[in-house]
């Protein structure tokens, strides 16, 4: 396995969670594992799916984080863009200075 040197963060609507998880799991050679958590977001790109979200000014989202090799992150992004082309999926890549396990 390549040395992980970046963190891919994906934020997307809860309705896309199963599709996103399925697509990431189809590429174990790129992403060995990931973490998901429910979050709320707001901003110019937010699409409000309910009256409640419009009133609150926030949208429910899922945040997926994957620590991986940067070249694999770009490959995975390409796969996801092709499989799930929507402006409702945001991503960014951040450097990882060190990654390990306690045992």
Where do the model's predicted regions map?
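Positively charged, small/polar-rich N-terminal and surface patches that mediate targeting and assembly
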Residues: 1-103
